[in-house]
Amino acid sequence: MSDSSAPDLPSKPSSLNAGQSSSLQTTNTGIGMGSGMGSGMGMGTYGNSYGSSYGGGYGSSMYGSGGYGMGGYGSSMYGGSRYGMGSYGMGGYGMGGYGMGMNTGMNGMGMAGSLAQGSEATFQLIESIIGAVGGFAQVLEATYMATHSSFFTMISMADQLSHLKTALGSMLGIYTVINWLKRIMGKLMGVKNKLTPDEFRKFQEKQMKKLSNSNNTGGPNKNTNKLSLKPLLLFLAAVVGFPYLLKKLIAHLAETSQMNGNFITSGGSLQGNLDPTKLEFARALYDFNPENEEMELKLARGELMAILSKTEPNSNQESTWWKCRSRDGKVGFVPYNYVEIIERHQRPVPEAQEEPAAAVLAERQQQPIIDSTEFQKMKT
């Protein structure tokens, strides 16, 4: 083959770099979210006071490993900031103020430091009470705002209903005016608008006659109470037919997706119907460990593979990374200089097989043709 030292990898196409950068971007996004949320809670309006107090306190170690030290309330207002390392520690009475010259020395553990350390728990308790009261005040404020907004919403709705009432009244007033005009026209023309008892009695007698005639003859509404089977048949068809059609549809979709999945897995989505007689095969010259196992194919020295494509998927140009398929069915890209193409040796078609057939044909053509007289002589 060649020497054992593997050559340098060629430059990757844009499709491989895009897949690798997307995975790295996902990882960096997770790191950014973690660091951003961690630092944002501590560096807010109150600095490390409420940030580290409620962030690291209730989140990681309030009374555990942090206690009132760096994790719980230590890094808050009265821990590492005011009475710890800030004001009365190394800054106030420690090294800066009265540390080196008077009382506390390098460590800041004099009278002021001991008082600050002793009163730290009390101030932290007061701080937690103030925080709880502040939270309760925020809840009350939110409740008040919700009640206020809902109250004014109801007022605006009542106002809109009053406008609707006015609009409906004006619309119904038109019909009132029309009825009033009809009455005036009836009075002018002598039409009686009021129904007299005699007229009502006549109307009632006519209705009774119509009802008796319909009961005797059957009438036009004879089959009104007969039950119809159409709603029942439609209901049964919907109950039985809809699940059947849905099952057929799901089976068809599953079969289609399975065929597409097999087609993509076999590499047919990019290469179409591959002809095995026209495929090129290659042998790995060196071991290759891919950086992105989803896009690249791992190679072992001497491994055989089939070359599916030598072009880039996006631009269809000649690429330095070839798409190959291994014996176990895995598909991926490999560098072109890590493999060698296996040349096929075509067997020549032997011409000796055609010579006997040609000789037999020539002999048959040279044989004399027997006519009818010679055939009669041969019979006698």
From Swiss-Prot:
Gene3D superfamilies: SH3 Domains (2.30.30.40). Residues 252-380 are cytoplasmic. The chain crosses the membrane at residues 231-251. GO terms for cellular component: peroxisomal importomer complex; peroxisomal membrane. Residues 1-230 are lumenal. Residues 1-30 are annotated as: Disordered. InterPro entries: Peroxin-13_N (IPR007223), Pex13 (IPR035463), SH3-like_dom_sf (IPR036028), SH3_domain (IPR001452). Component of the PEX13-PEX14 docking complex, a translocon channel that specifically mediates the import of peroxisomal cargo proteins bound to PEX5 receptor. The PEX13-PEX14 docking complex forms a large import pore which can be opened to a diameter of about 9 nm. Mechanistically, PEX5 receptor along with cargo proteins associates with the PEX14 subunit of the PEX13-PEX14 docking complex in the cytosol, leading to the insertion of the receptor into the organelle membrane with the concomitant translocation of the cargo into the peroxisome matrix. Belongs to the peroxin-13 family. This is Peroxisomal membrane protein PEX13. It comes from Komagataella pastoris (Yeast).
